[in-house]
Regions:
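Membrane-anchoring hydrophobic helices of lipid-metabolizing enzymes
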Residues: 2-132, 166-175
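Catalytic core of membrane glycerolipid acyltransferases/transacylases, capturing the structured
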Residues: 124-182, 207-211, 219-220
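A short, structure-level motif marking secondary-structure boundaries and short turns
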Residues: 46-48, 103, 151-153, 172, ...
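Juxtamembrane/interfacial segments around transmembrane helices
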Residues: 95-96, 134-138, 280-283
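Short Gly/charged-rich anion-binding patches and loops
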Residues: 26, 60, 116, 140, ...
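Generic secondary-structure boundary/loop-capping signal
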Residues: 103-109, 115, 135, 159, ...
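Non-catalytic C-terminal accessory region of glycerolipid acyltransferases
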Residues: 2-5, 53, 76-82, 122, ...
Length: 308
């Protein structure tokens, strides 16, 4: 089967090995019942605490922002880093909200912009290859999107079996099913069947799976070629999806189709895609996942790290 077999609850989850996990789960669950403005305030405070606990991640975020936007003054980079840290703290609670909030509460603070692009693709008999940008609130956004159009996505198993159980079933609440992260054929099959499939094109997957094209101010950024493989082999139309904050709550924004990706030469296509991604990230740069080393992989082993 292409879909991952849902993990089952095990009585061993009640043993001492998982007690600390359960404490964290109960605290998160309790906080999710608070009003959203209060949850956001708690999240911001948590983000500041995270900055004290893992200062290396703060340093990585600051470096990524400075590399991507070399035109920014140091004060602006510092301000964006602080806000990104607050959003990182909020992401912990947004994940819990995405897993456990009742549907009525999600619908009340969630909206979708650009869904007509999905409808148009489906009317043409095409699948939708949703290129989802790795924003902090992605977990919550996927849950909200599922109430309008259930999606399919790759799944990476969590190392903690209890968290994996909660994570899988939380993500599956409003979506169709999930595919093992290495099962490319299953994703292509789903796209050929006119499904909406979500894929993260903006991560560093290593030198062997990438070519180096510009992203913002970094002229040689490892960019996955798998994105084009799916766009070319499947009966689909690619389009970018992003999740954004609003005064009301959250929004998934869907951008115009990019059928040209499948026709362009590989380097030109990925350069074009990265240009679009960087432009969209700049709409709410404080929400992007800057804390991972996006520019870790360099073209050659002898190249100096951008993080030293």
């Amino acid at each position: 089967l292409s879909a991952i077999t849902p993990p089952s609850f095990k009585w061993s989850f009640l043993g001492p090995k998982y007690w600390l996990t359960w404490i964290g789960v109960f605290v998160l669950y309790a906080i999710t019942w608070l009003p959203l403005p209060l949850i956001r305030r708690i999240g911001a405070g948590t983000g500041r605490l995270v900055g004290l606990i893992v200062p290396k991640r703060v340093k990585v975020a600051k470096r990524n922002i400075a590399l991507t936007y070399p035109e920014l003054e140091v004060s602006r980079v510092d301000a964006l880093t602080r806000e990104n840290l607050r959003r990182a703290g909020m992401a912990l609670f947004e994940t819990a909200m995405g897993w456990w909030w009742p549907g009525w509460r999600i619908r009340r603070c969630f909206e979708i912009e650009g869904y007509e692009h999905v409808e148009a693709a489906m009317a043409q008999g095409k699948g939708v290859f949703g290129l989802a940008l790795h924003n902090m609130n992605l977990e919550f956004a996927c849950r909200g999107l599922g109430y309008t159009h259930p999606a399919i996505a790759f799944y990476r198993k969590h190392n903690n079996p209890l968290v994996d159980y909660l994570q899988y079933h939380g993500r599956a609440r409003s979506n169709k099913y999930m595919i093992h992260k290495r099962n490319a054929k299953a994703l292509i099959s789903a796209l050929d069947s006119q499904e909406l499939c979500l894929y993260l094109p903006d991560q560093d997957y290593g030198r062997s799976q990438s070519i180096f094209v510009p992203f913002g101010g970094v002229k040689e950024t490892a960019t996955s070629t798998a994105t084009l493989m799916f766009a070319r082999r499947a009966n689909c139309i690619p389009m970018i999806f992003t999740s954004q904050y609003t005064t009301k709550g959250y929004k998934v924004k869907i951008y115009p189709p990019m059928p040209e990706l499948a026709e362009m030469e590989t380097r030109a296509a990925l350069t074009h895609l990265n240009t679009q991604v960087a432009t969209i990230v700049a709409e709410q740069p404080e929400s992007y996942l800057w804390m991972h080393k996006r520019f870790k992989t360099r073209p050659n082993d002898t190249d100096a790290s951008l993080y030293d």
